[in-house]
Design a protein with these regions (language model features):
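A glycine/serine/threonine-rich, flexible loop-to-helix segment
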Residues: 4, 52-53, 153-155, 179, ...
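Active-site helix of classical SDR
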Residues: 123, 162, 170
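Residue(s) in the substrate-gating loop at a strand-loop-helix junction
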Residues: 144
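Substrate-binding pocket helix/loop in short-chain dehydrogenase/reductase
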Residues: 99-100, 107-112, 197, 205, ...
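Canonical Rossmann dinucleotide-binding motif of NAD(H)/NADP(H)-dependent dehydrogenases/reductases
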Residues: 6-40
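Alpha-helical segment proximal to the catalytic Tyr-Lys
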Residues: 128, 175-179, 237
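Short C-terminal tail/terminal secondary-structure segment
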Residues: 2-4, 212, 229, 240-253
């Protein structure tokens, strides 16, 4: 790719949760590759004994983000394959709409383990390589509109709490890592057409929801990926600790 047209030329990126072809992570992977990055995709769906070498600028590695040891091993392989690390996108996550009166402790813990602790685990494992980067290193975390509006729709209190924690964690990272040259920002998607949302509302409710969104539609994974690209690239070189809403105006605050 012509470097003049590429926002991530020469950058090395780790993206978690990219195995589902209809998810946000896959859209980020596709866009980053198109913008000149080399990418390590971490997902629990990949085989633990899979090949660890780049093919067409990409390597797929097994990682259970809820387990620190798995993250340490995956990041070590990713950094070796990429030759370093400049961008981390913590995209892996789960969602459920269980209401508090039906919410068992193990489900609450699982939500936090994947969404919040998983973000910590991967970030902690990636940090040594990010601190060595001389290419304006950046962390982009995935929050949610649910964290800003108090759950609802497909996200219960445990989902909102986990994503609210991600937003607070991101802001703290920005303060701690800014003096060391690492930026940390967050994207908060609204209702995005992925497997997590498609077919979950019913036709009538879906139309009512869209009418309540100023842009009158749900978002696409590609539109979230574009916001992530902005935060990962040097276009946002003086932005850290911010939350970018990608919700069509569904939540304006």
């Amino acid at each position: 790719m012509d470097g003049a047209l590429s926002l991530l030329a020469g950058k090395r990126a780790v993206i978690t949760g990219g195995a589902n072809p209809r998810g946000i992570g896959a859209a980020v992977v596709e866009l980053f590759l198109a913008q000149g990055a080399s990418v390590a995709v971490l997902d629990h769906a990949y085989a633990e004994d899979g090949p660890g070498a780049l093919v067409d600028g990409r390597v797929n590695l097994h990682c259970d983000v809820s387990r620190g040891a798995s993250c340490e091993a995956a990041l070590a392989r990713a950094v070796q394959a990429l030759g370093g690390l400049d961008v981390l996108v913590n995209n892996a996550g789960i969602v459920a709409a269980t209401r508090i009166w039906d919410l068992p402790e193990d489900e609450f813990r699982r939500m936090v383990d994947v969404n919040l602790t998983g973000t910590y685990n991967v970030t902690h494992a990636a940090l040594p390589a990010l601190l060595e980067s001389t290419r304006q290193p950046a962390i982009v975390n995935l929050g949610s509109t649910a964290a800003l509006r108090g759950g609802g729709l497909l996200g219960g209190s445990h989902y909102a709490a986990s994503k609210g924690g991600v937003i607070s964690f991101t802001k703290a990272l920005a303060r701690e890592l800014g003096p060391r040259g690492v930026r940390a920002n967050c994207v908060a998607p609204g209702i995005i057409e992925t497997d997590m949302t498609l077919g979950k509302f019913g036709e009538n409710w879906e139309q009512e929801l869209k009418q309540g969104i100023p842009l009158q539609r749900f978002g696409s994974p590609a539109e979230v990926a574009q916001a992530i690209l902005f935060l990962a690239s040097d276009l946002s070189s003086y932005s850290t600790g911010i939350v970018v809403d990608v919700n069509g105006g569904f939540h304006i605050h």
